[in-house]
Curated annotation (Swiss-Prot):
Main location: membrane
Assembly notes: Monomer.
Keywords, comma-separated and alphabetical: Lyase, Membrane
Residues annotated as domain PI-PLC X-box: 25-198
Biological role: By hydrolysis of the attached glycolipid, releases soluble variant surface glycoprotein containing phosphoinositol from the cell wall of T.brucei after cell lysis. It also cleaves similar membrane anchors on some mammalian proteins. VSG lipase may play a role in processes such as parasite differentiation or antigenic variation.
CDD domains (UniProt xref): PI-PLCXDc_like
Name of this chain's protein: Variant-surface-glycoprotein phospholipase C
Alphabetized SUPFAM superfamilies for the sequence: PLC-like phosphodiesterases (SSF51695)
Pfam families: PI-PLC-X
Length: 358
């Protein structure tokens, strides 16, 4: 309960309606799941088309032996979430980062991927539909961001992709509706999904990614390097006088680590090196609490690394979608609140209390 408002992860947007209804989607704090749909990756899952070609071209018996000897190191670093799409949504996640892959074994079968093939797109869409047709969650908004397509071609497989998307057509918010529209206006209809696609597709509900949101990959693994890069982005936008008013784009803060080759090598040794991370889960479990504390300090106190900054109204840099690996991991302490908060609770707190952007 924040500010006298009771909320649940399945319905936090509806529960905090009085606090967020005058905001547009780009002004609402929420948690995003990096590489959502990778929960299905297992030790011997087939390589996706986003995996290095040298690995994909190896004979099956060689890849089997390689995975066996390294205890499936590539799958342990390829899996960014261990919750299904429905579980992520029930947990309170409202932004799903998705990568698509054409299956090499079944013609036109579309799967999620991150170095390894995971679950069918149809399963992803079904989970989203089941969530939105649950009465408690019927007023929640969801952002589907399809940013990578491996093995697709415009004339055939992209057409199949659009056909599969039609399973949720009744929920898509038309592209004619501006992203600056207040949520109170959007709640007047039953459409709840912002559909974002990186390549242009002929579909009236698909927003071109470059127009709909800003999401900068910082390409760092070490925590301090990651925070430094995120703060560089904030500093740059603080100096941009053109930023103001109601943001016309959503903003994704990529609070995620990007593993290097040496991370894979060390992990293959099964954690033989002290302080090393055997998988992405371990790395996220270590980083997420620090990232949540940084996000809190910036948005509540206007502080970056101990120094106060002034955030112009309308600047949603690091003030909208917090993208995480293993979103359920990590908590931070919030002033005036007895119990530590996870990422979703922190975002609800920011939405219902005074912030440095208010």
């Amino acid at each position: 309960m924040f500010g006298g408002v009771k909320w649940s992860p399945q319905s936090w947007m509806s529960d905090t309606r009085s606090s967020i209804e005058k905001k547009c989607i780009g002004q609402v704090y929420m948690v995003g799941a990096h590489n959502a749909g990778t929960h299905g990756i297992q030790m011997f899952s087939p390589f996706g088309l986003d995996a290095p070609e040298k690995l994909r071209s190896l004979p099956p018996y060689v890849t089997f032996l390689l995975r066996f000897l390294t205890v499936g190191v590539s799958s342990r670093w390829g899996r960014c979430q261990n919750l299904s799409i429905r579980q992520l949504l029930d947990h309170g996640v409202r932004y799903l980062d998705l990568r698509m892959n054409i299956s090499p074994d079944q013609e036109n079968k579309i799967y999620t991927t991150h170095f390894h093939i995971s679950v069918p797109l149809q399963e992803v869409l079904k989970d989203v539909k089941d969530f939105l047709t649950t009465p408690a969650s019927a007023n929640e908004f969801v952002i589907l961001d399809f940013l990578h397509f491996y093995g697709f071609n415009e004339s055939h497989t992209m057409k199949r992709f659009v056909e599969e998307l039609q399973a949720l057509e009744e929920f898509y918010i038309p592209t004619t509706v501006s992203l600056t529209t207040p949520l109170c206006n959007l709640w007047q209809s039953t459409r709840r999904i912002f559909l974002v696609v990186r390549p242009y597709v002929e579909y009236p509900y698909a927003r071109l990614r470059s127009v709909a949101l800003k999401s900068i990959w910082v390409n760092q693994m070490e925590l301090n390097d990651l925070l430094d890069r995120l703060e560089e982005l904030m500093t740059r936008d603080l100096e941009d006088v053109s930023i103001g008013g109601v943001p016309s784009k959503m903003y994704v803060t990529q609070a995620i680590g990007t593993p290097r080759n040496n991370d894979f090598a060390v992990a293959a040794c099964c954690g033989a090196c002290p302080g090393s991370h055997p998988d992405l889960y371990s790395a996220a479990k270590h980083k997420n609490p620090h990232l949540l504390k940084w996000f809190y300090d910036l948005n509540v106190n206007g502080v970056m690394r101990g120094e106060r900054v002034t955030i112009r109204r309308g600047n949603n840099t690091h003030g909208n979608i917090l993208l995480l690996d293993f979103v359920q991991e990590g908590t931070c302490t919030v002033k005036g609140v007895d119990k530590p908060m996870n990422a979703v609770a922190l975002c609800v707190h920011l939405n219902t209390n005074q912030t440095a952007r208010s």
